[in-house]
Amino acid sequence: MPKRVLQGVVVSDKNDKTVVVKVERRYSHPLLQKTVRQSKKYKAHDENNQFKVGDLVSIQESAPISKDKRWVVLTNEAAG
């Protein structure tokens, strides 16, 4: 099964080798017929501490790294 890849914004880089990425998804509410925004935060592994708050990044699912970390940062999307 392929690994999931998500895009989000780094909201915290205070932990060593870890960033918190906020991923937002939009969907149409079945009853209200409105577009609803929903967000979720993922802890992702950042080996070199190179990503800072506000960076747009891609994260990929991986094997568990710690109790909460199951994602790895792939690339900085803003850089291209």
Curated annotation (Swiss-Prot):
Signal peptide: none
Keyword entries, A-Z: Ribonucleoprotein, Ribosomal protein, RNA-binding, rRNA-binding
Gene Ontology terms describing biological process: translation
Positions of disulphide bridges: none
Molecular function in Gene Ontology: rRNA binding; structural constituent of ribosome
A cellular component term, taken from the record's GO annotations: cytosolic small ribosomal subunit
InterPro entries the record matches: NA-bd_OB-fold, Ribosomal_uS17, Ribosomal_uS17_bact/chlr
Transmembrane segments: none
Pfam families, alphabetized: Ribosomal_S17 (PF00366)
Subunit and interaction comment: Part of the 30S ribosomal subunit.
UniProt function note: One of the primary rRNA binding proteins, it binds specifically to the 5'-end of 16S ribosomal RNA.
Family, as annotated: Belongs to the universal ribosomal protein uS17 family.
Protein name: Small ribosomal subunit protein uS17
Organism annotation: Brucella anthropi (strain ATCC 49188 / DSM 6882 / CCUG 24695 / JCM 21032 / LMG 3331 / NBRC 15819 / NCTC 12168 / Alc 37) (Ochrobactrum anthropi)
Gene name as annotated: rpsQ
